[in-house]
Swiss-Prot record:
It is an enzyme of class 1 (oxidoreductase). The gene is gcvPA. The glycine cleavage system catalyzes the degradation of glycine. The P protein binds the alpha-amino group of glycine through its pyridoxal phosphate cofactor; CO(2) is released and the remaining methylamine moiety is then transferred to the lipoamide cofactor of the H protein. It catalyses: N(6)-[(R)-lipoyl]-L-lysyl-[glycine-cleavage complex H protein] + glycine + H(+) = N(6)-[(R)-S(8)-aminomethyldihydrolipoyl]-L-lysyl-[glycine-cleavage complex H protein] + CO2. CDD domains: GDC-P. InterPro entries: GcvPA, GDC-P_N, GDC_P, PyrdxlP-dep_Trfase, PyrdxlP-dep_Trfase_major, PyrdxlP-dep_Trfase_small. GO terms for biological process: glycine decarboxylation via glycine cleavage system; nucleoside metabolic process. The keyword Acetylation does not apply. This is Probable glycine dehydrogenase (decarboxylating) subunit 1. The glycine cleavage system is composed of four proteins: P, T, L and H. In this organism, the P 'protein' is a heterodimer of two subunits. The lineage of its organism: Bacteria, Bacillati, Bacillota, Bacilli, Bacillales. GO terms for molecular function: glycine dehydrogenase (decarboxylating) activity. The keyword Oxidoreductase applies. PANTHER family: GLYCINE CLEAVAGE SYSTEM P-PROTEIN, GLYCINE DEHYDROGENASE (DECARBOXYLATING).
Amino acid sequence: MSHRYIPLTEQDKKEMLDTIGASSISELFGDVPKDILLNRELAIPDGEAETTLTKRLSRIASKNVTKETHSSFLGAGVYDHYAPAVVDAMISRSEFYTAYTPYQPEISQGELQAIFEFQTLICELTDMDIANSSMYDGITSFAEACILAFNQTRKNKIVVSKGLHYQALQVLKTYVKTREEFEVVEVDLDGTITDLEKLENAIDDDTAAVAVQYPNFYGSIEDLEKIHSFIEDKKALFIVYANPLALGLLTPPGSFGADIVVGDTQPFGIPAQFGGPHCGFFATTKKLMRKIPGRLVGQTEDGDGNRGFVLTLQAREQHIRRDKATSNICSNQALNALASSICMSALGKQGIYDISVQNFENANYAKAQFKEAGLEVSNGTSFNEFVVKFNKPVKDINDALLQQDIIGGFDLSEVSKDYENQMLVAVTELRTKDEIDTFVKKAGELNGSK
């Protein structure tokens, strides 16, 4: 008897075998040599009742360490922020949840308008002219920005600060690995911030672009105005990898003359989930509009004069120009872009500003507590991350903290041995005063501080 919801019943098997003229499964696989044919049943247990299975999986899941069971001070690119309940409610609508690239605008106006709103929000945050419909993640956006700079300027050198996320630097090097003419010059830091003298000396007439992070990977806030002054007469592009939440408080890169602003909207409505998926953004100037990678949604009018939305400037893309396309990127992160759009819209300008201030104040409170506990904090001005120096390996301290329901900061020795015994601590709006005090107290005790 066929079963309506369970596939591959005995009746299903019989009907398929009859259709192809085989009397049994053994006859179906008769061409497979006997010496390699599996001659036993697969060791798969019988099915369980849904109630039993749910309980068993819940027991297994309860062994996980999560930000719901522990207070988390881990950041380094993935942060523990609050997402309003409306985010999941809205993105769970089937029209959004199952949609793909809206090639047919006449039946995809809702999806296209949602993407258009995302582009608009990114432009407002970054103070740039145009933004694409999103990219896979912030690091992909950064690497694509560098490729754009090479192609636009026809120069072969990118000057990058070592204050950029170390994985962003790795991805960039992977992108240019097969292009021997391209050179990536890394500029050292002075403590936790870019050494401006070395940066200025590294920039010359062969420089395609200068790239920095804002705030940088170590939490410090780079002097974008000063850096831009080094670039102006060199005809190089200025690329800024920015934390979009920080832009609720900090002056946006566009105000400092940035040519391309990229980043990751994970702080807006995208949970910290095994490192992804994320949502990269890419914003630039009108001058570079036809060089931008990825999808672009534009606003137009139909034959009756009604406002409508379409995919525009598609001649840049792979499905039109193939090998002459501006990028190999031919998709986006529509669902996560929608989540970020809903989150930003729900918070509003004031809400984004308020959360940015909470991050800044919580981090500065934590910095002061660490200093009071006798630990050295490397940063001057920072947003919601900073570096703390310990006397012992950070791994040992984090292992001990985990036993006390605390997820410690990122172990910077994973980036370089130069950062041995140094922890990158992230403090978001979700950390309470009690959680911060407990974290500092326990970390100080484990370090042997006062």
